[in-house]
Amino acid sequence: MKREVNAIWKGGGADGIGHLNVQSGAFSNMPYSFKTRFENENGKLGTNPEELIASALAGCFNMKLAFVLNEADFNP
């Protein structure tokens, strides 16, 4: 399976802005910036690339663990 992601960044580190796109369509043209690492435009918490990576790793770990447990005749 091949998946593509596009990340565009314009500007400096603290004042720049980027947009993320994923092939699956789960999100398209999603903005991210230094500010969204801590809050979004409404003052609520935002996301950041590290959080997205951690979410992907946690999801993969959970699925793999479920497969391993099933192979050992355990029902997770």
List the predicted regions and their residue ranges:
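Extended beta-strand/beta-hairpin segments
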Residues: 1-55, 62-76
